[in-house]
């Protein structure tokens, strides 16, 4: 399995970002880390190894970028407005830098996005905000309501980065063309977030699969079962 390391200066964030890329061809998949995880986390915890076959067969090319959790939602040392503004710049980086990069390299005009736990938030927020750029959304143990990080403060930056708030009123036609899988499990602490998101999608008649696995907890073993299954749905 080929692996490449990239470091670049993001003009949208005005800081350096790092990323690992696995594979040399195939459908582009942007895979986000969990809470405060770095670009190498999904490799370190075995999530990349569990989909090695898809990479080796040239079916997918997986992009594992850094996030800015410490500069945005998890930074209690700055005002919630600053947390939200920083995250809006991160979203702009995805739109203007990373997603076009992945599409250009693979020759595909959309990306798949995925993530476990808080990585599921990153994936869902990007997919639902920019469905014109996303064909597949795979979340595993995701949570989708960012208001728990805003100390009661609320503004437009929070609204437009909170899927449970902006999605009900969005009518972008590409939303109904997306392949959406919400993966959770019986003992997942984020199960209720997934049920709530599924209800929102049902109210909008958006086709999706709410995959609730029995017995499992909010942890890597069940996510490593889910991820190859979900990648197999990419056509």
Where are these regions (language model features)?
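Non-catalytic cap/lid and distal C-terminal segments of serine-dependent acyl enzymes
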Residues: 1-235
